[in-house]
């Protein structure tokens, strides 16, 4: 499995100095990508804020739509897809030669109410399959990597109780990765979660990876969400998680 490292920053106002120092992406170009998220829904950054876009394009080498590709925004009604904001971010990323991380195809949060009202399990499965197909197809050749499944684990390493687990069974993760791979065998596919520095949760993620690999289902990367501060986790815990 390929090791791909990103360092992501949520946007914060920056004070520009008169000199032009080496940019962040130039400084770390030989080590890893420097990533930023763009929240188009709340701030309309692509439409309104050229200063922020200038900072993002000059200092960052990767971009992630914070909300635009999530189910609530991309597939708000049963038969309705809305890609306008996601497309704006995609165009910005490609125009600036940036790596684009698609986030996310299957997540228990920010899901429209209609999804949980689909009572027939076979129809639910087909709906998830179509959701993945539509998003991956729409951004095929543009998105470099998809977070296929996001935050499927509890901190004890067990699968989180979600509508996807209830309606598709405990192999719903395998199905999601297979659907994504079938739609675009060239895009990179990732599982993404937080608190993976905790041993039990990390073991759960490893079980997911091993299960996929044993069944011949492709997974290329694991996203480690860095919701950290100066006090935790320790450097040792971070290193153990990465290794």
Predicted segments — roles?
Residues 1-24:
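Bacterial Sec-dependent N-terminal signal peptides
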Residues 19-62, 66:
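Boundary/entry segment of secreted carbohydrate-active catalytic domains
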Residues 21-22, 58-76, 85-197:
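Substrate-binding cleft and catalytic face of glycoside hydrolase catalytic domains
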Residues 38-49, 71-84, 153-155, 196-204, ...:
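Acidic-and-aromatic substrate-binding clefts and catalytic sites of carbohydrate-active enzymes
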Residues 42-59, 125-136, 201-212, 237-241:
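Short, acidic/polar
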Residues 50-51, 77-79, 115-117, 159-163, ...:
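Short, glycine/charged-enriched secondary-structure capping and boundary segments
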Residues 91-99, 167-189, 202-243:
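Glycoside hydrolase catalytic-domain groove-lining segments
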